[in-house]
């Protein structure tokens, strides 16, 4: 509905504005990822909305990453490939979120020209109990590395999970092991004091 589109635009603008504030308080540039829905991508003015959010916030576009789901690949392929290439032309990076849970297609993965794969937390959480989950995580990491994609594992809660992922060659991780979600004022205070 129209409300979802308006909300998505507000989230994107707010995220860019907050990223500007965060980087004013950070000793090194920090990147932010924003989930974008299939409905947003379908909007004919999406690129204009993104470009406006970047200019209004005055952020370096290389610090913004848009997270897309595998379902984006199910849209008109030529339209999506063109749109994603134009987004990358602005300097914004792209990540496939929750990789391995949707319509994983190697041909789409190559054609969509993404920068990063985010390994779904359901596999990460189960990899110490399930050989199948562990093999899936390892396979995604090997695939990503062979395609020269950055990899990030979602939902890391235990040091043992982080160690396994590091040994497998995963580049980055996110989850409660590292930090819980923080409200912007608390994050800014944390950045200022460190």
What kind of feature is each model-predicted range?
Residues 3-79, 155:
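Catalytic core of bacterial c-di-GMP phosphodiesterases, primarily the EAL and HD-GYP domains
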Residues 37-44, 63-78, 90-194:
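EAL-family c-di-GMP phosphodiesterase catalytic domain
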Residues 50-53, 82-90:
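Catalytic-core regions built around general acid/base machinery
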């Amino acid at each position: 509905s129209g409300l979802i589109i308006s909300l998505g635009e507000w989230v994107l603008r707010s995220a860019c504005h907050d990223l500007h504030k965060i980087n004013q308080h950070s000793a090194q540039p920090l990147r932010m990822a924003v989930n974008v829905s299939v409905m947003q991508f379908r909007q004919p003015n999406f690129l204009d909305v993104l470009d406006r959010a970047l200019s209004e916030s005055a952020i370096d576009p290389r610090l913004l990453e848009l997270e897309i789901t595998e379902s984006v690949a199910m849209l008109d392929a030529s339209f999506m490939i063109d749109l994603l290439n134009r987004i990358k032309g602005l300097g914004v990076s792209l990540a496939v979120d929750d990789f391995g849970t949707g319509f994983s297609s190697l041909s789409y993965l190559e054609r969509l020209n993404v920068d990063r794969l985010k390994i779904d937390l359901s596999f990460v959480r189960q990899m110490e109990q399930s050989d199948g989950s562990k093999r899936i995580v390892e396979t995604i990491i090997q695939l990503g590395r062979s395609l020269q994609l950055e990899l990030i594992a979602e939902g890391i809660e235990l040091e043992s999970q982080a160690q396994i992922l590091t040994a497998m060659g995963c580049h980055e991780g996110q989850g409660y092991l590292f930090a819980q979600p923080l409200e912007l004022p608390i994050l800014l205070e944390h950045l200022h004091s460190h």
